[in-house]
């Protein structure tokens, strides 16, 4: 009977560990995702606003809570950013999204898939903008425009 109880206990602990509910799995997985989310936030918080002399962090366009990282598999992560424009009719929301994408594509040290959205209910044309900033062809076309590329470069430039 003791042997059966031990086997049952071992089996249950393995199932819980593999599903992420054990002492080690439960603490380990969220901690890694939190660290990666902070790493992402540290990269985007210093992006400058296209029309104001402030960073996106200072304007609360991005906050720590707007970054989510999920594990896709062992070496790949899904990074989701939900930013909040300063006003619901912000004409530069698409440009801000482009700056976020460019900075993260260049600087993230781990393999990732990137999804960038305007926080729900914070912009009058959020659906259209969300489509634009998550469309690879539109992003590539935007970065071919020398004037737009120069603005993006100025916004993502690291402060001294």
Swiss-Prot record:
Residues that coordinate or bind Zn(2+) 2: 89, 123, 150, 153
GO CC term, one of those recorded: cytosolic [4Fe-4S] assembly targeting complex
UniProt keyword Zinc present: yes
InterPro entries: FSCA_dom_sf, MIP18, MIP18-like
Binding site for Zn(2+) 1: 89, 123, 150, 153
GO annotation (BP), single: chromosome segregation
Tissue: Expressed in interstitial cell lineages.
The keyword Metal-binding appears for this protein: yes
UniProt keyword list: Chromosome partition, Cytoplasm, Metal-binding, Zinc
Top-level taxonomic group: Eukaryota
GO MF: metal ion binding
Pfam families: FeS_assembly_P (PF01883)
Disulphide bridges, residue numbers: none
Sequence similarity: Belongs to the MIP18 family.
Subunit text: Monomer and homodimer. Component of the CIA complex. Interacts with CIAO1. Interacts with IREB2. Interacts with APAF1.
Function, as annotated: Component of the cytosolic iron-sulfur protein assembly (CIA) complex, a multiprotein complex that mediates the incorporation of iron-sulfur cluster into extramitochondrial Fe/S proteins. As a CIA complex component and in collaboration with CIAO1 specifically matures ACO1 and stabilizes IREB2. May play a role in chromosome segregation through establishment of sister chromatid cohesion. May induce apoptosis in collaboration with APAF1.
Protein name: Cytosolic iron-sulfur assembly component 2A
Biological source species: Mus musculus
Gene: Ciao2a
């Amino acid at each position: 009977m003791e042997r059966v109880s031990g086997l049952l206990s071992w089996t249950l602990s393995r199932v819980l560990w593999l599903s992420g509910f054990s002492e080690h799995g439960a603490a380990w997985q969220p901690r890694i995702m939190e660290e990666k989310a902070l790493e992402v936030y540290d990269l985007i918080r210093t992006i400058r606003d296209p029309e104001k002399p402030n960073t996106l962090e200072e304007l609360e366009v991005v906050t720590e809570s707007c970054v989510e990282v999920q594990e896709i598999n062992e070496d790949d992560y899904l990074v989701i950013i939900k930013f909040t424009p300063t006003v619901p009719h912000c004409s530069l929301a698409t440009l801000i999204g482009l700056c976020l994408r460019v900075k993260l594509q260049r600087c993230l040290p781990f393999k990732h898939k990137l999804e960038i959205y305007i926080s729900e209910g914070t912009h009058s044309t959020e659906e259209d903008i969300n489509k634009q900033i998550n469309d690879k062809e539109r992003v590539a076309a935007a970065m071919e425009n020398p004037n737009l590329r120069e603005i993006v470069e100025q916004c993502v430039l690291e402060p001294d």
